[in-house]
Amino acid sequence: MIRYISAMPSPEWEHETPRTLALLGSTGSIGTSALRVVEAHPHRFKVVALAGARNVEKLAAQAARWRPEHLGVLDATGAAKLRDLLPAGYAPHIHIGPEGYATMATLPEAGTVLSAQVGAAGLRATEAAARHGKVICLANKESLVLAGDIIRRHCAGSGAVILPVDSEHNAIFQALQGHDPASVRRIILTASGGPFRGRSRDDLAAVSCRDALAHPNWNMGAKISIDSATLMNKGLEVIEACHLYGVGIDDVGVVVHPQSIVHSLVEYEDGSQIAHLGTPDMRIAIAYCLTWPGVVDAGVPRLDLVKAGSLTFEEPDLHSFPCLELARRAYREGRGMPVVLNAANEVAVSLFLSDRIRFLDIPDIIARALDMHDGTTPHDIEGIEALDEATRRTVYERAGHSNTDGMA
């Protein structure tokens, strides 16, 4: 039985033109793709806010093109640099840090918020948008991994709408349209398998960061590329599915599909399955969310099944890639474990990207963090942030490094 996380927009929302957008994470892969969609359909959208993190030069270029009234950066140093880079005579309001991002997510002039910041740093803004009744195009899966129950309650109270940008969850969302929620038997997420599909643990012992970043199908940022290589990305998506669709962890299956053509499937009680197919390009899902319930040309190459050739599927290798099962464990056990899982993973990925640990150390670090968790169960955003910070500090200390990352 599907119980979606939020209501859908009222019918008149379809005719809102232009849609007013706050793009949080505009300098990343998702944000850049979103602006390409906006560029292709300028009459449909008005960009009122753009937020990046450390890539101030790119944010300045975006701001010069779109001239939003609000910009967001990570810190005061970035804000000063941004002001110097903006065109003469253009003086938008600049918001700083997580609180600034959250303020941007609640701007009265922004009807739709694209939550595309990387990792736990996107939680505050997503939670704020949910409290204020926004239409949220959600790419930041960590928001639901960390605070799915809280965000569901906010949506129920405010009328906020969540539309999933993740290609897999967008596929599920589309496959559910027009069907009785009670007729759904299970959800099946597809995974590409990443750049190391078919490798043994012995093979993985010597892989480099550069190897892990070379995804065979998708153009993604560094953090999600590593998550794809470890299968943690799919683990987080399994947890996300439980919150988005109100299903149990055992009702969410995962199959490896190396071609990344079938984005996910829904199985119904009659034994049938409905799949969503398309070219592996995030603009399809982004355009679908930004214009829902309408459909526009996303600007991607058309899928030709004859040229695509064979579509194959296989079971994930949980021995070589244990992160998927670690995510399932964290969700089953609850008691703050998903927060610990995500924090430990973000630290481990950061250490790997800076060549301070090996690839196979990533799941080991996460497993140790889960084993050490004392059962603390956060009940609000402040509690989640406190557990996140404590976990990061512990993981860094055990790894022999200083804590330089966090939810900010």
UniProtKB/Swiss-Prot annotation:
Any single biological process term in GO: isopentenyl diphosphate biosynthetic process, methylerythritol 4-phosphate pathway involved in terpenoid biosynthetic process
Molecular function via GO: 1-deoxy-D-xylulose-5-phosphate reductoisomerase activity; manganese ion binding; NADPH binding
Entry's EC annotation: 1.1.1.267
SUPFAM superfamilies on file: 1-deoxy-D-xylulose-5-phosphate reductoisomerase, C-terminal domain, Glyceraldehyde-3-phosphate dehydrogenase-like, C-terminal domain, NAD(P)-binding Rossmann-fold domains
Catalysed reaction, written as an equation: 2-C-methyl-D-erythritol 4-phosphate + NADP(+) = 1-deoxy-D-xylulose 5-phosphate + NADPH + H(+)
Pathway annotation from the record: Isoprenoid biosynthesis; isopentenyl diphosphate biosynthesis via DXP pathway; isopentenyl diphosphate from 1-deoxy-D-xylulose 5-phosphate: step 1/6
Amino acids binding NADPH: T27, G28, S29, I30, A53, R54, N55, N140, E142, G221
Annotated binding of Mn(2+), by residue: D166, E168, E237
Disulphide-bridged cysteine pairs: none
Cofactor (UniProt): Mg(2+); Mn(2+)
Domain of life: Bacteria
Keyword annotations: Isoprene biosynthesis, Manganese, Metal-binding, NADP, Oxidoreductase
Alphabetical list of NCBIfam families matching this protein: Dxr
Family the UniProt entry places it in: Belongs to the DXR family.
PANTHER family reported for this sequence: 1-DEOXY-D-XYLULOSE 5-PHOSPHATE REDUCTOISOMERASE, 1-DEOXY-D-XYLULOSE 5-PHOSPHATE REDUCTOISOMERASE, CHLOROPLASTIC
Function noted in UniProt: Catalyzes the NADPH-dependent rearrangement and reduction of 1-deoxy-D-xylulose-5-phosphate (DXP) to 2-C-methyl-D-erythritol 4-phosphate (MEP).
Name of the featured protein: 1-deoxy-D-xylulose 5-phosphate reductoisomerase
Origin species: Nitratidesulfovibrio vulgaris (strain ATCC 29579 / DSM 644 / CCUG 34227 / NCIMB 8303 / VKM B-1760 / Hildenborough)
Lineage: Bacteria, Pseudomonadati, Thermodesulfobacteriota, Desulfovibrionia, Desulfovibrionales
This protein's encoding gene: dxr
